[in-house]
Structure formats: C-alpha cells, structure tokens
Amino acid sequence: VDKVDYIENRNRWVAKDVPAFKEEPFMTSETDFISKINFELSYTRFPNSGTKQYMGTWADINKSYLEVLGEEIRGNNFLKKQVEELTAGKETPEDKIASIFWYVRSNIQWDGLIRKYPTHTMRKVIEDKKGSTAEINILLASMLEKANVKANPVLISTRDHGFVREATPVSSQFNTVVC
C-alpha cells in the first residue's frame, strides 16, 4: 500500500500561573505530582491488517503477562532435583516456602536491575548466582511450583516509577514483579 488515509486531531492545552514544582522529602516519583495530560495509544487500524489493540483491560494485561511468564515458571525442569533436596522432610507448604525462599535469598544476588521480564534463563541465573528483580522472583516462583506450592507473580510499580492509575490499564505502569 503506497497511501494511507488518516484523521489527525490536534489539540492544544495551556496552563497559566502554574506554581513551581517543589520536591518534598520521601516523595514518590515527581511525575505523580506534576500537572500533565497523558495519552495512551488505544488501537491502530491499518488497511489490510485489521485492528490491533494496545489498551485493553486489567484482565487482558494479567492474561498476557502470565502467558509470557507461565512457560518460564512451569518449565525449568532442571530445578526439580534441587527443589526435592531443599524440601526433603518438609511437610507443610510453609516449610517448603521458607526453605526455597532462604535458598534463593542466600544464593542469588540482585544485579541492581529492576525488570518485569527476565532477560536471562533461570539456568543462567543459577549459574551466575545473580539476576534482576524479575529473574530472582521468577526463579522463586518456578522453584515453588516444582515443590507443588502455587506461586502468583504480581506486577508492581516501584516508588520511583510512580503510581498505578487504575483507570488506565496499560502494562507500562509497572516496572517489576514480585512473588
């Protein structure tokens, strides 16, 4: 297609006599307090390609994230033996959780990176003994699953990343995952 027709909307907003922004101690991200208008792309519809949604519902975000990470959590069968050793003699789920948690905490160092998706395999995280927030928490979730303990990763936004606005279901509001 050599030509695409489109509709362009131009808007202009002006704010007058806006007081200066003053940073306060213990404040979360300054972008949460500065007056602004945010725009999010809802969808695109190009000729011969249908409509692509970018903004859906919270359920869509949850489903999409769990589809991506589900394989990572359920996979990693190389962890099975290690988990069996860590949980040997542990009767309750709480004891299994504690054993696995302390193993991960004691053996995997945080590399300083805050991520919501792992960039390395869990095998590499174990070998290197370090990982991002996502890698450490997904490793924990994967090991818990191997011990037959349900693990639910949760997307969150750190204080510097800003508040999550419930009215705007977009995954860019989150910057890390915890388990």
Give, region by region, the residue ranges found by the protein language model.
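Short, flexible loop/turn elements at secondary-structure junctions
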Residues: D17, K129-K130, L155-T158
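Hydrophobic/aromatic-rich core segments of domains that either
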Residues: I136-C179
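Contiguous, well-ordered alpha-helical segments that form the cores/surfaces of helical PPI scaffolds
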Residues: F101-R105, K124-E127, N137-S142
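Secretory-pathway-linked proteins and extracytosolic
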Residues: V1-G112
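Secondary-structure capping and boundary motifs in well-ordered enzyme cores
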Residues: T92-K96, V125-I136, V170-S171
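Active-site-proximal cofactor/substrate-binding loop regions of enzyme domains
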Residues: D95, S99, Y117, I126, ...
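Short acidic (Asp/Glu) and glycine-rich catalytic loops that position anionic groups and cofactors
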Residues: N76-Q82, Y117-T121, R159-H161
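Short, conserved helix/loop micro-motifs enriched in His/Cys and acidic residues
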Residues: D111-G131
